[in-house]
Amino acid sequence: MSILEKDLTVKKATREAFGDEIVKLGKENKNIYVIDVDIAKSCKTVNFIKQLPDQHINVGIAEQNAAGLAAGLATTGKIPFVSTYAVFGSLRMLEQIRQEVCYPNLNVKIACSHGGLTPANDGGSHQAIEDMGVLRSVPNMTVIMGADYYSTRKLVEQAAKVYGPVYLRFTRDTVPMIYDENEEFTIGKVKKIKNGSDIAIIANGDTVRLALEATKELEKQGISVKLLDMHTIKPLDREAVVDCLNIGKIITVEDHNILNGLGSAVCEVVAEEGKGIVRRIGVQDQFGQSAPYEKLLELNGITVENIIKTAKELI
């Protein structure tokens, strides 16, 4: 069965994927540690604490201390995963990530739930709309967001094996199970969902499911879509973007500020490598508000309908 034919009603949050995978990895490698900031239940590390208590440290509500502790552990050969919310893991900890983790290029992983607008009713203060953009500008940092449960598990596994700082972003809400358990993923290499010739759609994270639904409808209307899951925005798969220039019309879709996120990363390659038209769908350079998640997406035009409309305008 192709991905376009899959039942997308079966859902699971990608933060749950992290919680399940980190237990597996911790049992396989005693050097893997989880550092919590008193929100283990929300970040799905409770099972890790129960099963591997000697590999867990809770620093309390002290994210900056967590980053410094992780850096210290990394110098002793440990592989620490700092687990927190995306808005804190990218901004509250930023100075420590830059100076203590990325500058010395230490093997620290920042694993963050509640990415993008998914905190929803918690309001704009808790919605990380700039996290991936901020951290992709820091040297040595890898930036990743899986689209669903299984892709996230595979990417967490790879993050544990690759040396260096990695930022992993997860959803708070449940998302459709797009991929099968046996699908393979490689950090820095796009996941091609479908080939096409009229327009290219590049999405990541939760917006892959929206791009998938839009693709189905566009195909019904005779528009051939190339659909890519760009789970890694740094290092970006430049070759995959350049290949889209054969089509020349690209739409990017992300639950992130359109400035300095996936859309900007794609535009950089297009500007450097050839001619093409790019339309960015994402958070419209504005703070969020307290509202249901789907309503926040709608307010920013991050919808199936807007993807279809934008595609037709380009064609």
Predicted regions and their residues:
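Thiamine diphosphate
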Residues: 1-169, 174, 184, ...
